[in-house]
Amino acid sequence: MRLLSILLFMIASSPAEDWPQYLGPGRDAVWREQKVELDFVKRPPRQVWSVPAGSGYAGPSVADGRVFVMDRLAKPYRAGKLKPGSNVNFVRARIPGKERVRCLRETNGEVLWEHSYEADYSSVYPYAIGPRTTPLVYKGMVYTLGAEGHLHAYSAEDGKVVWQRNILKEYEFETPLWGTAGHPLVEGDLLICPVGGEGSTVVAFDRRSGKEKWKALNAREAGYGTPVIETVNGHRQLLVWDAENLN
């Protein structure tokens, strides 16, 4: 069991900038907050609160006074004896458990809502620890993608499931060796998600309804990269890095 902790930094009276998705507001890992005390020797940060959490690799997102985080709830897994010459880093196993999404109050860690669902893992077992992707918060919605392809859209206010899909099952694609790890992104009314397979390496869904809008590209394996959108020569371009190509 890990602890999720929030540290208090000495910041001016204005509220700190939100961090609503993977790599922050600009998806570039840049924190643009001003007047932040960074001399931790002179003025070290102090812990404000902590709450128990399950296992996982996903970072928290922060938006509108709330913290959104994913984790995994499962009993410890004990592997059987490996065959001679087997590399433990490539041995798959079916491991029962649940994935969970929680919303906490930013000021004190109070759990405002949570949702869990069955998610048996089938990736290589030493890394079958938990979700990889940070929740994405956008215009009152929270989007999460689990390690086995469970894609959910929640109401940020009360945690109601607005829509859900299992992208690996629907697009008939085997769970990547180290789990689904590419983060979805929002562009206008679209939620763009890396998937994998023939014609569905990347899929765009209506972010409000979850309906497929388009799909593109072929890849033998999904890869673990996160799509990026940049304006190049005046045009919005989607960059997708799969297991074989940069598209």
Task: Give a label for each model feature.
Residues 15-247:
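Noncatalytic, solvent-exposed loop/strand surfaces
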